[in-house]
Amino acid sequence: MSYAQKIVIHSKSGATNALEALVEQFISDGVRFVAVAGKDCALMEDIIDEIVVGDGSDNTRFILTSSHPGESLEEVMQFARIITEGTGEPQLIEL
C-alpha cells in the first residue's frame, strides 16, 4: 500500500514504537506532509522530525510536519487539505 502525499495522524494512544517504521514508509512513498492531532501530538511531531532528519547526512529526506494540540480532527483535516505541500486529499491514519 502506498501512502498519499498528505497524511493526518490521529493519535489515540500517544507515541508508539511503530512510528519509526511508519515514517520510513512515508519517506519511501514520497509523502510530503504529515500533520498530527490527538494525544501527545507535539511529541509525535518531534519524533517524526528526528526520524526524517536522522544524522543529517541525507538532504533528500524531507517531510513537512505540523502538530495540532487542542484542535479537532476535522480542523486538522481541513488544514491538510489547504496546505500547498503535496497534492490530493489527505489520508487519515489512526494510531
Residue ranges and their predicted role:
Residues 1-95:
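ATP-dependent carboxylate-amine ligase
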